[in-house]
Swiss-Prot record:
The gene is porA. Heterotetramer of one alpha, one beta, one delta and one gamma chain. It catalyses: 2 oxidized [2Fe-2S]-[ferredoxin] + pyruvate + CoA = 2 reduced [2Fe-2S]-[ferredoxin] + acetyl-CoA + CO2 + H(+). This is Pyruvate synthase subunit PorA. One of its GO terms (biological process) is response to oxidative stress. Keywords: Oxidoreductase. CDD domains: TPP_PYR_PFOR_IOR-alpha_like. It is an enzyme of class 1 (oxidoreductase). It holds the Pfam family PFOR_II. GO terms for molecular function: pyruvate synthase activity. InterPro entries: PFOR_II, Pyruvate:ferred/Flavod_OxRd, Pyruvate_synthase_PorA, Pyrv_Fd/Flavodoxin_OxRdtase_N, THDP-binding, Transketo_C/PFOR_II. It comes from the Archaea. Its EC number is 1.2.7.1.
């Protein structure tokens, strides 16, 4: 294992290199671009033996991923924002075709107005596509999650694609120490992809054929069952990863939740700030905890209910908006926790900074609520 001070984008590229995909179709887009650049260099320098395809668009990138995966090889790609939106048609196809693709998404706001800065609207818009979704907090977690995603996606009981989501600029361009495991250890944890079904000219078959009402619903139900099965596969993979590499992950992560009266729920890099503020609030006598939702799909319903069982109030921070009802995570958690007070807070859209003062405001508004959903950090003239 080697310790390097690198960005989360480089951490993702290092993880992809360690996973040894055979095909990498990618189209660069800010703030994902350096992922594609690192991978291109790895291939050009002979460090990674893969077919690096310089496609003309993100739609083509995902189409090439589907074709390569259907032919039975491990594939990787990366995108962001408008690129993911352009992929939308094929994102759904990849899940329906049961292609175990792994894709990194550098979370960035969607136009309009045009923004290159961070929020999570792009990946949230794909939450119903049939892809597993992991939201990471650090460069280390980004690297580890790419490796874990291959292990889970390629399991014969799952065979669904995975999206590793990392906050644009906040993570993608920030450097920090990251442990890079040895190729030998990764090969032991992640063996070569063994496809169950693949396109083979010697044994012709069809993949992704037209279907009618007699079969379509059952096909979608198979995706649902695979998503449900993935929970235990994720937990098992995380246990084995911890035994080999010493870092623990799960569907969710609890921080000072056991005796918390108020629990803040969030995804991604903001969780680091939340921990710092929670420690300060604890010093002031406020019983506040954090529930980090690491895996958004499959949705960790039982883990969320268990984590908040002792809390009287729950505050959900969303870096996205489902217009007229609040953030996506808030709508799901409020539906899940009908027996307690759940409040939603829209934060950080388009890269708006989320400060410790904003988090303290969220706690105050949860203690003395005025409405179910509140936008935090707006300019005064907009309120």
């Amino acid at each position: 294992m080697v310790l390097k001070v690198i960005s989360a984008n480089q951490a993702v590229a290092e993880a992809a290199k360690l996973a040894k995909p055979k095909v990498i179709p990618v189209y660069p887009i800010t703030p994902q671009t350096s992922i594609s650049e690192y991978l291109a260099k790895f291939v050009a320098d002979g460090e990674l033996k893969a077919e690096y395809i310089r496609v003309e668009s993100e739609h083509s990138a995902m189409s090439a991923c589907v074709g390569a995966s259907g032919a039975g090889v491990r594939v990787f790609t990366a995108t962001s924002s408008q690129g993911l939106a352009l992929m939308h048609e094929i994102v759904y196809a990849a899940a329906g075709l049961r292609n175990p693709i792994v894709m990194a998404n550098a979370n960035r706001a969607l136009s309009a107005p045009l923004s290159i800065w961070n929020d999570q609207q792009d990946s949230i818009a794909e939450r119903d596509s049939g892809w597993m979704q992991i939201y990471v907090e650090s460069g280390q977690e980004a690297l580890d999650s790419v490796l874990l995603s291959y292990r889970v996606s390629e399991d014969r009981d799952v065979l669904l694609p995975s999206m590793v989501c990392l906050d644009g600029f906040i993570l993608t361009h920030t450097v920090e120490p990251v442990d890079i495991p040895s190729q030998e250890d990764v090969d032991s944890f992640l063996p070569e992809f063994q496809p169950q079904v693949m396109l083979d000219p010697d044994e012709p078959m069809s993949l992704g054929t037209f279907t009618d009402p007699d079969y379509y619903m059952e096909a979608r139900y198979e995706v649902e069952k695979a998503m449900e099965r993935s929970r235990k596969i994720i937990e098992r993979a995380c246990r084995e990863f911890s035994e080999m590499f010493g870092r623990e992950y799960g569907l969710v992560e609890e921080y000072r939740c056991e005796d918390a009266e108020i629990i803040l729920v969030a995804m991604g890099s903001v969780c680091s700030t939340l921990r710092e503020v929670i420690d300060e609030l604890r010093d002031k006598g406020k019983a506040v905890g954090l529930l980090k939702v690491r895996v958004h799909r499959p949705f960790p319903a039982e883990e969320i209910k268990s984590a908040v069982r002792n809390a009287s109030k729950v505050a959900v921070l969303d870096k996205n908006i489902t217009f007229s009802v609040g953030g996506a995570l808030y709508t799901e958690i409020s539906a899940l926790l009908r027996d307690r007070e759940v409040y939603g807070f829209i934060v950080g859209l388009g890269g708006r900074d989320i400060t410790p003062a904003h988090i303290e405001e969220i706690v105050r508004r949860t203690e003395n609520p005025e409405r179910s959903v509140t936008w935090i950090g707006l300019k005064e003239e907009s309120e």
